[in-house]
Amino acid sequence: MLFKKKKVLPEKLPQHIGIIMDGNGRWAKKRGLPRSAGHSAGAKTFQSIARYCNKIGIKYLTVYAFSTENWKRPKDEVDAIMKLLRDYLVDSVNFTDENIKVKFLGNLSMLTDELNRLIKKAEDDSKNATGLCLNIALNYGGRDEIVRSVQKMAENGVDLSKLTEQELSDHLYTAGIPDPDLIIRPSGEYRLSNFLIWQSAYAEYWFTDRLWPDFSEKDIDSAVNAFALRDRRYGGTK
């Protein structure tokens, strides 16, 4: 367990963790399996990690499930991902029973009516949960989020010449959610890939070569303990 092994004090825990769930395809390829098998394995890891973050006291977890750029992938792979999402929403673990609040971030208008109905139900069913706030970034892109937010403000008559950082933040998908303290990226890649690019201005980063389906509670422990040792100055000095 995290607290017994490393004795990370609750006040040293990151309040908000963001995870770029990467490496499903490579995991499957290494095993001679279709990419869909990697996504299925990654979905199980997602559920396990969400439960663990809730258990150790993380307040917010945002996972990058499907980007605006992922539509460029082969249709059969996209269809497999959407089926996994549907199966998760209909048949899989009910996070509401574990006091986890579920919220979806992204341009959901491009999804099917059925998926949107299931997403709304998942959000409504968990809205009173007081444990982990689990944000699932779906058809999400950081640049797209900013553009849509500015467009929405312009449509609502906001004087953009007087726009402040706080006003923009208040119109993002993440409005009301604190900025991430820690961004985790598995799979050996060292980039943000358009994930929470506005919100992560002062986030700490933690990278690992481990592919997402192999990611475990021990990796969360390692990331959280590394975070606890860092000196966050937010551009100032101490």
Where are these regions (language model features)?
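Flexible, compositionally biased loop and terminal segments
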Residues: 1-238
